[in-house]
A protein has these predicted regions:
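Structured, non-membrane catalytic/scaffold regions adjacent to prosthetic-group chemistry
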Residues: 1-44, 183
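C-terminus-biased signal that marks the final domain/tail of proteins
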Residues: 6-10, 20-23, 47-183
């Protein structure tokens, strides 16, 4: 492919790719100095669900044997091992936690925007408020972030264009992150 032949220089990008039948979210990160190419993962968003991204890699673990719903660079895991960034099992490999670990800034200034959109249209998002405030907890054998939001949520109702516009325009009004409340 083009990235393998010509390279890719970026700390990372997230893409929403869609047609009338399906939507995919793809994350792509250049291999860095002295390397050519990129590592990437793409996941199909399940029917009836929504996803979002805002300047922070969000794909964590992913199925390795489901080409109908997941595609990834052949060396996405082996490259991390070669660099000494990951020693765990293939099953536990988390793209975001290995290549772009979420920190306070990633959670508070990027993921919080996704949380705000999800919070407007899906019940149960209050359990991720602490994470949206920038509190990232770590656990497990690889010490990955353990309180992250899901990559996608099922909205409480079918969304209208106006609903989506409201999500895009949200500034945390009416939440604990409301900037008019001096937080």
């Amino acid at each position: 492919g083009l990235v393998e032949d010509y390279g890719y220089y970026s700390s990372g990008e997230s893409f929403s790719i869609s047609d009338p039948e399906e939507v995919w979210i793809m994350e792509l990160i250049g291999k860095g100095e002295g390397e050519k190419g990129a590592v990437w993962v793409a996941l199909k968003v399940p029917d009836g669900y929504i996803s979002g991204h805002a300047n922070q890699a969000r794909i964590t673990t992913f199925p390795k044997n489901d080409p109908e719903n997941c595609m990834f660079a052949e060396d996405v895991i082996s490259f991390a091992r070669e660099k000494g960034w990951y020693e765990g099992t293939d099953e536990d490999f988390s793209f975001s936690d290995v290549y772009v670990p979420v920190d306070f800034g990633g959670a508070r200034f990027c993921e919080a925007r996704v949380w705000a959109g999800f919070n407007k249209v899906a019940s149960g998002m209050e359990k991720y408020t602490e994470y949206a405030r920038g509190v990232v907890k770590h656990a497990g054998p690889n010490n990955f972030a353990s309180n992250r939001m899901p990559l996608w949520v099922k909205p409480d109702k079918k969304l209208s264009v106006q609903d989506v516009m409201g999500m895009m325009r949200d500034h945390f009004e009416g939440t604990v992150l409301d900037m008019t409340q001096d937080i």
